[in-house]
């Protein structure tokens, strides 16, 4: 099949088509060399075109038990070489895919110019003009104002905790902004009953759970577009312990007076080093985000930073009962160095705080 990738600025790259269709999205890359099944089913890649920097994708097949959600989320996939297994899977999912492209050059372009819009056209009759038409119709990530609706549950779902878990009496209200399955699994394995609520859940929805912990999940896009989750943090902070991962950290920071900003090309991979400012310990982490906390505000302490660029990786408040992480402690894919995060946040449920944040 013919295939064309149109990059922001109008440059068109020819490739080999592996899965037919036309699509568009923000072109990003991951440096992960394993875990392609988990990456492709991660809801945080919604409305993006995912480029794999590792040259061969698919060399250990496709197994559903590794999926992080029930579908592929990137709008299209770019690789140096895709195996037939992955190409067929993407075709079944209706996701265009191309390979035989110089991904090293493409990744360099993204690193130097930042994440960019792109359009893709794949098919026996595909043309460069088709890809350019997709590029012209492409929106920026911040313009997807209701992206949460594309990745969230529509109705509450309850996952019962393991009876022998250490926190078998805990109820967690997890606001699903695009949650990975492994986050839910990590909480359930520790005994917590996880009540997954829609991204636009109301105070009444949360009150119906009467949670011991409010958890804001990961998700795609601009945290400014998750105003309902931000409002929940503002309502419950100081009354109910709060945790967040990835987008969840950004939402919590915004609710407590902080700011967020778009990164040039983000952090996406399984080898991002993070340093704990108290212990000076460095752990390797899995990350997938294009936005970060700029100014964390006065209510939260920066407890961990990225070794490469000093961006905030951990924001905590002992007084308010808040623990958030920009990276993915649940990994999948990636290292398991930070699984104790789930014990730390569930530990907050043993003595619920009642301290209110100070007024600005």
Model-predicted regions and their roles:
Residues 1-171, 177-184, 188-189, 198-200, ...:
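RNA-binding accessory domains that recognize and position tRNA/RNA substrates
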Residues 33, 288-291, 327-334:
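Glycine-rich phosphate/pyrophosphate-binding beta-alpha loops
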Residues 208, 213-290, 334-342, 348-352:
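Cysteine-nucleophile active-site neighborhood
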Residues 315-357:
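A glycine-centered loop/beta-turn motif at secondary-structure junctions
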């Amino acid at each position: 099949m013919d295939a064309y990738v149109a990059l922001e600025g109008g440059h068109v790259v020819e490739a080999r088509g592996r899965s037919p269709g036309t699509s568009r999205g923000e072109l990003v890359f991951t440096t992960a060399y394993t875990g392609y099944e988990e990456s492709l089913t991660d809801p945080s890649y919604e409305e993006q075109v995912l480029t794999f920097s590792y040259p061969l994708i698919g060399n250990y097949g496709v197994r559903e038990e590794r999926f992080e959600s029930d579908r592929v989320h990137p709008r299209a996939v770019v690789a140096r070489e895709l195996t037939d297994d992955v190409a067929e899977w993407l075709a079944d999912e209706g996701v265009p895919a191309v390979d035989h492209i110089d991904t090293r050059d493409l990744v360099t372009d993204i690193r130097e110019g930042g994440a960019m819009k792109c359009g893709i056209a794949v098919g026996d009759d595909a043309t460069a003009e088709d890809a350019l038409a997709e590029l012209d119709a492409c929106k920026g990530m911040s313009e997807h104002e209701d992206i949460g609706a594309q990745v969230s549950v529509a109705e509450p779902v309850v996952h019962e905790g393991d009876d022998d878990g250490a926190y078998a009496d805990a109820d967690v209200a997890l606001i699903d902004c695009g949650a990975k399955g492994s986050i839910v699994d990590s909480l359930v394995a520790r005994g917590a009953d996880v009540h997954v609520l829609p991204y636009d859940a109301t105070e009444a929805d949360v009150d119906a759970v009467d949670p011991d912990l409010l958890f804001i999940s990961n998700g795609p896009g601009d945290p400014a577009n998750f105003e309902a989750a931000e409002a929940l943090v503002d309502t419950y902070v100081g009354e109910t312990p709060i945790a967040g991962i990835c987008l969840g950290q950004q939402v919590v920071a915004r609710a407590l007076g902080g700011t967020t900003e778009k990164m040039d090309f983000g952090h996406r991979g399984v080898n991002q080093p993070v340093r704990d400012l108290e212990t000076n310990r460095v752990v390797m982490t899995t990350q997938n985000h294009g936005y970060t906390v700029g100014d964390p505000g006065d209510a939260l302490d920066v407890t961990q930073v990225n070794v490469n660029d000093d961006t905030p990786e951990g924001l905590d408040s002992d007084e308010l009962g808040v623990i958030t992480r920009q990276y993915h402690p649940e990994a999948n894919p990636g290292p398991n160095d930070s699984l104790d995060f789930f014990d730390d946040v569930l530990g907050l449920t043993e003595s619920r705080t009642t301290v209110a944040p100070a007024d600005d």
